[in-house]
Amino acid sequence: MSIVINWKPDLIAIEDIQLQEFREGKKVDSDNIKGILIFKTLARLQGVIIECCIEQGIDYTVCSTNTWRAHCKVKGSTRSDKKRSMQLLVKEWHDVTVTEDEADAIGIGYYASEIYGKQNTIVNWEE
């Protein structure tokens, strides 16, 4: 919360959560239960973040993973391919090497700033 108060962002972008579906023919096991518990924890965290945004008067958006990845032109068919693609895009854009999570955060921010960010115009007062 202190980072929000100190930085006073115009917008906070949150990646949407998704419940991994059970595979057909697979019985419910500890992996499925773990996935459900993770989903519930992320849903609660998302709610807390949204409530903080509302309390502080900060705009927020919840971004679908597929939507921000498509906007950033992420390539790949598997999860790991898409993660690596986003890392390479960040390297291309900013010439920095980042982790998968950092690359995803940059991609979400890139998407949100272009789609929802305030459009600032420069006024030439000398004219």
Residue ranges and their predicted role:
Residues 1-127:
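Phosphate- and other anionic-substrate recognition elements at nucleic-acid/protein interfaces
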